[in-house]
Amino acid sequence: MRPTTPSTTESPDNFSNMKLLYFSNEFPHDDLAGLSRQLTLLSKQKQFPHLARFLDHATEAVRDEVRQLPWSLRNTIPSFDSVFNFIEHASLRKGELGASIDGVLLVVVQLGTLIKYYEENPKKYDLNTGNAALSGLGLGLLSTAAVSLSSSVSDLAVAGVEVVRLAFRLGVVVGSVSSNLESRDPTSPPVSWAAVVPDVTVDEARDELDAFYAREKMPSTSKIFISAWSHNSVTISGPPSRLKHLFRTSEFFRGQKIINLPVYGGLCHAAHLYNQEHVREVVSETDSLKELSSRASPKLTTFATSTGKRFEAETARELFEQIVAEIMTKEIRWGTVVDSVLAQAHTTSCSDIQVLVFRKSLPVYDLLTAFSSKQPGLEVSTLELIPTIPASLDNGTPVSGGSSKSSIAIVGMSCRMPGGATDTESFWNLLEKGMDVHRTIPADRFDIDTHHDPKGKAMNSSHTAYGCFIDEPGLFDAPFFNMSPREAQQTDPMQRLALVTAYEALERAGYVANRTPATSLERIGTFYGQASDDYREVNTAQEISTYFIPGGCRAFGPGRINYFFKFAGPSFSIDTACSSSLATIQTACTSLWNKDTDMAVAGGMNVLTNSDAFAGLSHGHFLTKTPNACKTWDSEADGYCRADGIGSIVMKRLEDAIADNDNIIGVIRGAATNHSAEAVSITHPHAGAQSFLSSKVLSAAGIDPFDVSYVEMHGTGTQAGDKEEMKSVTDVFAPAGPKRRSMRQPLHVGAVKANVGHGEAVAGVTALIKVLLMFQKSMIPPHVGIKNSLNPALPSDLAERNVRIPYTRQAWPREKDRKRIAAVNNFSAAGGNTMIAIEEPPLPRNIAPEDEDPRTTHAVTVSAKSKVSLEGNLKRLIAFLENNPDVRMSDLAYTTAARKYHHNHRIAVAAADVPQLKKKLSAQLNSIDSVKSISNLQPLIAFAFTGQGASYKSMDLQLFHHEPTFRSQILHLNSLALAQGFPSFLPAVDGSFPKDHAHSAVVTQMALVAIEISLAAYWASLGVVPNVVVGHSLGEYAALYVAGVLSASDAIYLVGQRARLLEERVQAGSHKMMAVRASLADIQKIAAGMPYEVACINGPRDTVLSGLSKDLDTLIEPLQKAGFKCYSLDVAYAFHSSQTDPILEEFGELAETGAIFHAPKLPVLSPLLGKVIFDEKTLNATYMKRATRECVNYLAAVETGAKLSLVDDNTLWVEIGPHPVCINMSKSSLRSVGAAVPSMRRDESNWATMAQSLSTLHCAGATIRWNEFHKPFEKGLRLLDLPTYAWNNKNYWIQYNGDWALTKGNTYYDAQKKALETAKALPAPRLSDLKTSSVQRIIEESFDGSAGTVVMQSDLMEADFLAAAHGHKMNGCGVVTSSIHADISYTLGSYLLKKMSPSSGDIAMNVADLEVVKGLVAQKNTKVPQMIQVSISTENINTGTAQLRWQNVNAQGIPDEPFATATLEYGDRSAWLSSWVPQTHLIQGRIEALETLAAQGIANRLSHNMAYLLFANNLVDYATKYRGMQSVVINGLEAFADVTLTTEKGGVWTVPPYFIDSVAHLAGFVMNVSDAIDTKANYCVTPGWSSMRFAKPLVAGAKYRSYVKMIPTVEDRSVYLGDVYVLQDNEIIGIVGGIKFRQYPRILLNRFFSAPDEASPSPNPTHGATAKAQAQPKTIAASHGDEKHFATSVQISTPSKIGHQLIVKPVAIQAPPPAGPVVVALKDPEVQGSPVVVASAAAAVDTNSVASKAISMIANEAALEQADLQDEASFAELGIDSLMSLVISEKLREELGVVVSGSLFLEYPTIGDLRSWLMEYYG
């Protein structure tokens, strides 16, 4: 049907008025975000249903278009739930898809606004009945098409969605074509492709452009052109760099005003770039377009902007094609549109015209001006639509109910059920067999003999001894889930199994993260039901440790699933008692319906270990006392049997599941939850509420109750519950009224609890999985709950109502005329009711012949995280093939590669059929031990681009015929070639000629480069992107394109022009090229004096010569006689020889003006220069000219790349070309390569080559986007339900011991309290009268000649000692300062000397080499002793030295490992003073210099109060008597202080600690206050010093001056050293030498300096302690925020067996056993990675080294085997999380003195990394 609008030649009835709708190419509002918000809010109101539908469907259309994009583009688009989300993504709108995104936004805003206007004013939509016309600019023309095709607002909402699709596709095509002209730099701001030049006529602009073309030779595709013009301005478009060059070099344009337009997406209105193929690419034949074309045709005149004429279109498709062609290929001449509008107004004799616009703009003003000047009598009005949208909306406006709900597809499921059901198949087996799997409560839960009393009299006991239990619920593959054994053991097994079943369900669903929009990580949520915390309450509560909270609290179950899979959607743990899992699934459905998520993982979990719940439910009369699962509907039903269970399902909206090619196993049509508010009690069921719920769900889903053929009932086996539920079901699904079920529509009912008991929180998902299995098996399993007779309380007319209880298996086949629908009930003891209506899955779609996968060879992959699992996965796949010999290879390859996660142990094989595949997989099974784990680091990838002559003259490329990315790129490049005046090169690639047919040089060479550019694009789409490129001869053009140096257009231009010049200037065949298998030196020696030229040096023994044919022929004989093979290359010209001389100058000129050379984005290995090119100057026209003539030294290029580490032994080499040549050169030139693969081979199918190459790269560690590989063929592929992952399980289980759950008594602390009392009652004996505040009691002294030992003990809680500690507070805790340790040293040193040498007189003492490995922090409880022990000993007092050791003493009086050591040296005061004299003037000079700097305002002078205020704020809060510094001058890390010692007395001391601190803590002040240190993020503490010497006593009230300069050490920049000088009256009287400070993150302050009794019980005693002490469990405190966590050490050396389960009991860690034979992963120089057996650990590694001890400690803390700690193992994979890392870091610091930061395991992510660091710095 043609438009009814009149033309100038054919005039219908005149209309008195006319309407013109104008759609601009500019956004109609400056605040686009605000406008979109208003449209969104309006769409939620009842009066705008069409607007709501349009916005919703437009979003779905864009989502569908995104799904079709190649990954490189798809990955740039974030997840979205509305197209308006894009507005906020500025970078997206200016990126590669900017044109698509802005085009969509423009169309949606325009049409959305128009729909809103006409919904508000429905009578005004009379466009197709009156004199109306449409006009638009650019993309605005697309919006006119939607209006032209629509008879109503409802039609407009539909047609508008198709226009949104076109706008998106148009941007994609424009971006693709434009990027071939000039690629954009994603790291730089976007640049404009168009500029307006005002006040210039079109003729002036054309003349100047013609002159520019005459000066500059360039490809026609790159030319600047006029895209739009009017009477007073011109828009000039072109590649940005060309535009910039024009405006910079043209004298004419330099004098004009240039306004760059925000056109960032590419070029339109370019007839030289686009053709009808591009138009068809945009207006592709889709189902939605077919439907629209079948029911809509153009109804209104739409003016073309190039001619002003109307579009003559009969169908929607024709109209779209004409408009898209207008946008892509035609100039905008707005004046012609203005003239046509005036003509129509005149022809129709209208008296008034209304112009509808979104807002006024220049084109509108031009139109209005024309009306007023040329038709002054015409009454013209304008209506701006944007102002009709209110700025704000009334919150009270009624809101619509929203769009209709989608059905929800279940696409994956997994379970662990009682009775040994470890998967859904074994679960079905027990259902099908009618098994009742109840059993006596197993011993791994609790002792049934003590916790069960059938009479119910024993306190806290269970009345029942039965339950239904999962076998070995502790089985878990901890390393797979990156959990340490310690974390796994302390994590609730139901949460672990939820994680496992979630993985399996996702695996069966074919889930791969971000594969499609519906699998975007940001749009996936996790929903699980859980109603108990047994394991946390009982098992882990026996010894609370690090993972007590994250391993046991319910929220962490779904949270851990989200964390492991990196889902960023919501995670919910829901407790509605018995209905938890189905209520959770309903919540997940709601989330999907509301589009809060696009995919949901949901389910429930229950593992029973707490006897309290059994006791409570027994006393509440819930549980049966008899041995059965549940006697559902039995006359003697007396309650339910508790059960374990874990179930997980994966859900999507149905349309998304279909689009994602998922296996749909069931379809949820409706779901809802209500509450039995009218029940007689909260736990009593209510039939009315249940019936109401069922009716509500069926009504909302549009389901006739009689269409439901099965109801899976809650069926707990209670008298009240069974009666009420059966009544509610029969009332709704099988009523007794006049309308009854026919005999053809029986209603079967069942209850899974009769088989596996009542799983409580997991009951709902258990029932749902049963129904899903019934759909799969087309079978209803027997109901086994009736043990005696049918419950007489049930309706007596069940048979008459056609309600059937299946006592035996019943067939439930698909029917042709109706779908199988089931209902699943799940009720809560707390009163909640949930019901789900579920329909059978749709039948798999038939695969049309044209959709069959054309590939003949396929890559099948198998992977795992361990070799054990890899072997298991491989065996499972082989078994699957044995059982399914007819499986299609394409489906198998698709499922294993594109629809599975890939792990670090990989196998991949290429095969053409199943027998071949089985043979290859079996071979792999026999060599499983040789499979190496790939590194987490991606290997380097090098692209090598082939030169000419490697393939047939004519090719027939399967990639061109079948692969869209490759084909599209070839076609685009061919279009460029045609546009540049060259012949098409398609005949050289499409098989239209025999393979030996010789094409022209132009065709052949362009075809080669085009193939290589397209191959690179294809590899990139598969995720294989180079880190470095090298091109051989002609291949260098493609290499430079990939490196970003040349655009595709310029590469084609240069290659075509070079080939044209060869054809025109050079005689083909006069010269030849000859390959010689010899080195250049060999050839030079043999062919000395003979004429030849060296064309290529391809390898150490691979050279190509060029020259006259006759000259090279004479070389053959001597070379062959010398044993060197020679063969001529099949090329028409001798490249890189004198034959090319005639073309060089002209080619250089063409390259100079015709191509733009950019700086490479990748390193380029240059065969011309033998160098690596990084800069922007080397690659230019001169380079291209030289590369044509000079030698190709491929060998030098590759060797240079290796020297610069751009390629290494693990680099993956990919040959980009029609046949492998370069990769062989690379292998011969390098020591080793990781892998080398071709893209194509002669005489081999492209798909066979690609399958093998992808398999090789995959196994070598490359990340292949397998989905992109299979995506073009997905219509012909099916997802297979393959075997799930073969877990490498171990049993992680903490056994509940004893009967404390019965007694509720806790005797844990009794022994400790008794020991404390004993310690108080029996103090250590005093052996001496010596008593000071710090040395309170000598408990041991022994002297033997010149050897002697003195041991003292002191209680830190003694008043003076405690006051001294509290005088030095850190983190609010009293900390024993090092000056107290110094006083103890001086006291004991003096005592020892007097005892052993009474006549020694006044001897000075040096406290040397003090090292404090752990701070001594005062406990909070002052009523309990806190004992320390310090010993001083000397082997020979005559040496003048003695050794000191500090130890904590536990409550049993046993000393722990030393926490500090020092050496006491006796010396001569006078000698010290004399030795210090030379340094005095130096120190004085530095002090004076600081004074000068302070006077100049450079250094800071701080008062007494300010100094200690800063000190207290940053780290240490000193008591008054410690505050000796009166003023401080500080500059960077240098300072001096004036000190006055306090006269305040307090305690008995040898050298008061507040004296020592006052003169020495200037160093600590500098390290914690100086602006040279990041004191905000870090703090510094001293672990000791080299020496502390005072030649004169420190005197109360005396004045001193201290000076220090701290310097960072070279070895460790976090460690600082300095000397503190103490001066009195300008004389050095003391030095604290080599004082050391170490920097720590401030976040660890709480961890290091907390009172010990705030964290954990006493530390574990040493190995020499008593047996009683060894029995104490060891706990390590790890602070995380304000919480305290405890890590319990667990030994697995003395397990007890219960059944088949390994029960691990918490015990103390014993001394490690002697080292036995071990296997150490030492690399054999010949066989990489081969293990070497050594006799013992000591022979392989130094077990006493810090590194070895640290690795052992990590194994111990994480409960890992030493064998697990191989160098390549990453801490993340071993499960060392943030909590565990804090525990280990503290242990390393405490026990080994290794000071580490909290980021240790991030900085050194693998065992090998950490071991190397420890060996380097600690040994």
Curated annotation (Swiss-Prot):
Q: Which gene encodes it?
A: pks8
Region ranges (Dehydratase (DH) domain):
1404-1642
**The name this protein goes by in its record:** Non-reducing polyketide synthase 8
Positions of the UniProt region annotated as C-terminal hotdog fold: 1498-1646
Spans annotated as N-terminal hotdog fold: 1336-1476
What is the phylogenetic placement of the source species in the record? Eukaryota, Fungi, Dikarya, Ascomycota, Pezizomycotina
Q: What is its EC number?
A: 2.3.1.-
For this protein, the record's InterPro entries field holds: Ac_transferase_dom_sf, ACP-like_sf, Acyl_transferase_dom, Acyl_Trfase/lysoPLipase, Ketoacyl_synth_AS, Ketoacyl_synth_C, Ketoacyl_synth_N, Malonyl_transacylase_ACP-bd
| Function comment | Non-reducing polyketide synthase; part of the gene cluster that mediates the biosynthesis of dibenzodioxocinones such as pestalotiollide B, a novel class of inhibitors against cholesterol ester transfer protein (CEPT). The biosynthesis initiates from condensation of acetate and malonate units catalyzed by the non-reducing PKS pks8/GME11356. Pks8/GME11356 lacks a thioesterase (TE) domain, which is important to the cyclizing of the third ring of atrochrysone carboxylic acid, and the esterase GME11355 might play the role of TE and catalyzes the cyclization reaction of the C ring.
Q: What superkingdom does the record give? A: Eukaryota
Keyword Phosphoprotein in annotation: yes
Q: Could you state one GO biological process linked to this protein?
A: secondary metabolite biosynthetic process
